[in-house]
A protein has these predicted regions:
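Acidic, Ser/Thr/Gly/Pro-rich intrinsically disordered interaction regions
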Residues: 1-34, 60-155
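Short, hydrophobic, well-ordered secondary-structure elements
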Residues: 32-54, 78, 82-85
């Protein structure tokens, strides 16, 4: 039996988190989706950091709003990870200061905090911190899949 690596621990945590009802398209706003999303970003960031350190950076650009320091999916997740302590100060019900939002399916508009958003795909969840967007399936699940493929290809 192989010893469990840190990467395996992150993969287990990521898949456990993704099984949460909070990541269903029809999840209500009453679910604990914000804490589940934060947990997901913590795990995915750890996973992508380990992959990067192993020389297997996940660097696709599709759907990533490339500007400034955000250059690929890994840097987008890192940017979101770096904002998590700031989000802890958001209080429920303070919509105008709420920086973490989500949108299901295709659409566009403004969140209560004034941030403009677009979500380009049906049957997809988009999560936003301020004006930065990450898609659950097209980006987060793809990044996880690429790490798994690179990791298990080595074994």
């Amino acid at each position: 039996m192989q010893p469990t690596t840190q990467l395996d621990k992150y993969l287990t945590a990521v898949h456990t988190t993704l099984d949460s009802p909070a990541f269903r398209l029809n999840a209500s706003e009453d679910t604990l989706w914000k804490s589940e999303f934060i947990q997901l970003i913590l795990c995915v960031h750890g996973l992508l950091t380990l992959a990067d350190q192993a020389g297997k950076r996940v660097d696709f650009l599709e759907g990533v709003g490339v500007n400034g320091k955000i250059q690929d999916i890994t840097s987008l997740i890192t940017w979101m990870y770096d904002r998590l302590p700031e989000l802890a100060t958001d209080k429920p019900g303070q919509l105008t200061t709420n920086r973490l939002n989500r949108y299901a399916n295709q659409g566009w508009g403004y969140f209560a905090n004034g941030s403009f958003f677009t979500a380009e795909f049906n049957n997809e969840l988009a999560f936003f911190i301020d004006d930065q967007r990450v898609y659950l399936n097209r980006q987060i699940r793809r990044a996880i899949s690429e790490v798994e493929h690179a990791h298990y290809q080595r074994l």
